[in-house]
Amino acid sequence: YRKLAQLIFQDPYAALSPRMTVRDIIAEPLEVMGLTQNREETDEKVREIAAKCRLNLEHLRRFPHAFSGGQRQRISIARTLVCNPNFVVADESVAALDVSIQADILNLLQSLQDELGLTFMFISHDLSVVAHICDHVAVMYLGTLVESAPTRKLFDNPSHPYTKALLSAIPSLDPDDSGKAQKL
């Protein structure tokens, strides 16, 4: 099961061991799960997924502290995808990044999804990110799933009161829309 389902963590700073090189960080799942026969095969898979995640070969020799937040998140994504999972949980995977880097990581995730045929469960509190990346949305309230629908349908016509309140709280650039947030 671990090979087929993987996780991208929220904080790329905390998710990477400062004592390991990027090569070793990405290779670790292959070695722990016994998915390669030797170092050459491991290195080939590491180089392949690093390139797909827009990491240069020179990056593989460095340590995590040498990278920006976006680069660290790409390293985390490479580590997640190196064992070729079918299902990936992205737990607030862009929340710690600034907006321009968020867009870059979201575009990378979408291209990897298309290229590798992945299914993502994208956990986020940022509804603009959810609207951009998700095909289907589920809303939780107090630990309970209260609504689930295709993204456009949920955003255009929410049925649960919490979903309505959540969507009404999204800031608007239209001055006529101010003050319309619903209270629970």
Residue ranges and their predicted role:
Residues P150-L184:
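Short catalytic/signature loops enriched in Gly
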Residues E31-G34, E40-E58, L167-S168:
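Conserved ABC ATPase "signature" region
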Residues H136, S148:
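Short, glycine/charged-rich "phosphate-handling" switch motifs in NTP-dependent
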Residues V130-H132:
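A short, surface-exposed alpha-helical micro-motif characterized by mixed small hydrophobic
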Residues F63-F67, Q71:
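Conserved ABC ATPase signature
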Residues N84:
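Conserved catalytic motifs of ABC-family nucleotide-binding domains
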